Amino acid sequence: MNQVKSFKYDVLIGPEDLCNREEERKSFLSAAKKGKRVVLFAPRRYGKTSLIRNIVGLDFQKGSRKHFLLNFDLMDVRSMESIEERLHTGLTHALSSHFSPKKILAEIIGYLKGFTVQIDQNPNTGQPSVQLTSKKKEAKKNIYDYFDSIKQLSKKYKLMIVLDEFHDIAFVEGAEALFRIFLQELQDTAIFILGSKRHLLKVMFQDSNAPLFHYGDEAHLYPISVEHWLPYFQERLHPAKLKIEEAALSYLVKKMYDVPNAICEVGEWLRENVPQKTIITKTVVEQQLSDLIQRKQSFAYLLQAYSEKEKTVLKMISFFEFVKEPSSDNFLKTVRLPKSTTSHIIKKLLDVGAIEFEIEKGYRVSDPLLGYYLLDA
């Protein structure tokens, strides 16, 4: 019996839930096998982590027993101690899932010279769980030990290293230089640097004074066309005896700023809430979006974290959907704020991830559903 497919959102997805990324999947897998360095720019909730870690990474690892995937989530790191914690989490998880306890104790332990290795049983899964205890007390020195362990592993295994939300190390003094030394010492290792805060990534990789200037090959994830979304939607709506018109889907995709996670969240809402045997029109989508937004009580609490001026800028960006020049006279007249104040707010909103910048379109609210909510807030 075939399992009914739903729309997955706010979770990491596998290939069965991926919509039209086959070309990118093949290209990135080829880059991984060749030991390339890739800097992947993509807005938040575009599925870059799922694509690189869950799909390309697993494809890479299945290619050979000597292939080994290491994933490090660097989102919101603000100190050397937090970087150390993420390195510990990534390395121990990879070791626990890839190697047997016997293999770790017989061989892998030799690559972990800066640590005391302990293997416990995970109480939730019953699976072996590796724990590394640092022999030094200073976070920076421990980071060097993690880097050294990874370099030693790279001599025995073909590694694919994923550094997710890498741009946040920019908030930690000295971290960029630390990573530059580490990355340059890895010879044939595939490195995938993922990031969504383009303004930070631009400084890190395009500023001639930055430690990582011109590192890696720049890559992007582009919007998925309605042409490819349509069969994806119809397949998941069909078991609920629903069908969506192309014009309605075009409207939905546009209002969700082409963000796959938001598109799928609305898709699942439609699947669960629209009466059976309904042909979903633009009018139905508009009504269902309003109903969905009314359930989003968390948005009101989220906005309490912003000043009135910051909320004004957010609301005006959501009104225009995309703003190319927030320093333009037209936008400044709309928000009724000085240019310097507006520029400061834009920078802050970018830093905290409240807004995104897309090269061809401009600034937009990061969460499309929040943007929709702001229209009536």
PLM regions: where:
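Conserved AAA+ ATPase "SRH/arginine-finger" region at the nucleotide-binding site
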Residues: 217-228
